[in-house]
């Protein structure tokens, strides 16, 4: 624990104690951008997969697995299949990997220069959706509560800008890149 006496020692040694974050994490909702549209599409696929698995056949959990694996893939590589379709249709991204001056990319790649809050969300949600899809398929349909909740929460997140997981990571010190200052 840092006290007044050893705060100066820690600062002199190059370690700066972090202040506890206050406030809430809210994404930019005054404009529509590529990442928000990807979240809406993922939420629709999650809710459709949950509903079809529940009402028709539990093999529809493959839609949930697809969203989960895609989310993990995006967090690790920066390449998003749905994002690239939207990019080709002219939707502007916020988290696009920066290019050299004057360059124009024909592919959308999310920033992967370092781990930041939004990348953590892609990874955490992707892993949890992937194992949940397998549990839905091979164990019990009760596991559909989780992807249905994630789908509904993602719609709320995309429209209101508020996400429970994002706020938790924000409070833990993850660097936000889509946050508005409150």
Residue ranges and their predicted role:
Residues 2-182:
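Membrane-interfacial helix-loop segments of redox and metal-homeostasis proteins
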């Amino acid at each position: 624990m840092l006290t007044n006496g050893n705060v100066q020692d820690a600062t002199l040694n190059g370690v700066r104690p972090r202040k506890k974050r206050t406030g809430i994490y809210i994404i930019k909702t005054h404009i529509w951008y590529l990442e928000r549209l990807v979240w809406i599409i993922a939420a629709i696929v999650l809710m459709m997969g949950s509903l079809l698995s529940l009402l028709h056949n539990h093999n529809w959990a493959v839609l949930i697995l697809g969203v989960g694996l895609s989310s993990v893939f995006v967090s690790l590589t920066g390449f998003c299949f749905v994002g690239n379709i939207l990019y080709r249709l002219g939707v502007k991204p916020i988290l696009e990997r920066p290019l050299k001056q004057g360059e124009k990319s024909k592919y959308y790649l999310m920033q992967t220069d370092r781990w930041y809050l939004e990348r953590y969300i892609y990874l955490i949600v992707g892993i949890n959706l992937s194992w949940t899809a397998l549990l839905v398929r091979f164990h019990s349909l009760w596991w559909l509560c989780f992807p249905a909740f994630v789908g509904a929460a993602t719609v709320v997140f995309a429209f209101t800008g508020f996400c429970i997981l994002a706020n938790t990571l924000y409070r833990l010190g993850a660097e936000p890149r889509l946050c508005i200052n409150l």
